[in-house]
From Swiss-Prot:
Signal peptide: none
Record keyword Cell cycle present: yes
Family: Belongs to the CedA family.
Any single GO BP term: cell division
Originating species: Escherichia coli (strain K12)
Gene3D superfamilies to which the protein is assigned, alphabetical: Cell division activator CedA
Role according to the record: Activates the cell division inhibited by chromosomal DNA over-replication.
Note: In vitro, binds double-stranded DNA, but not single-stranded DNA.
Protein's name according to its UniProt entry: Cell division activator CedA
InterPro entries: CedA-like_sf, Cell_div_activator_CedA
Subunit structure, as described in the record: In pull-down experiments interacts with aceE, dnaK, glmS, lpp, rplB, rplC, rpoB, ybcJ, zwf.
NCBIfam families (alphabetical): PRK10113.1
Coiled coil: none
GO terms assigned for molecular function: double-stranded DNA binding
């Protein structure tokens, strides 16, 4: 008899983007990406939704941050 997988109905924790009025002043805009800024050595995406920005988690690669931004944008188009 096989053992059941532990924590079968464990909730998936999803990242809830922080809402900010604007990217912080000490963030450096990455010219080659639409939504990516460099913040404390990490790459963060800021996506303008309505009147505020949604902030991504910190990524080590700028492409990942841009991919996150594109995904958020697509989800935003679906809900509106």
């Amino acid at each position: 008899m096989k053992k059941p997988l532990r924590q079968q109905n464990r909730q998936i924790i999803s990242y809830v983007p922080r809402t900010e009025p604007a990217p912080p002043e000490h963030a450096i805009k990455m010219d080659s990406f639409r939504d990516v800024w460099m913040l404390r050595g990490k790459y963060v995406a800021f996506v303008l939704m309505g009147e505020s920005f949604l902030r991504s988690p910190a990524f080590t690669v700028p492409e990942s941050a841009q991919r996150w931004a594109n995904q958020i944008r697509q989800e935003g188009e679906v809900t509106e």
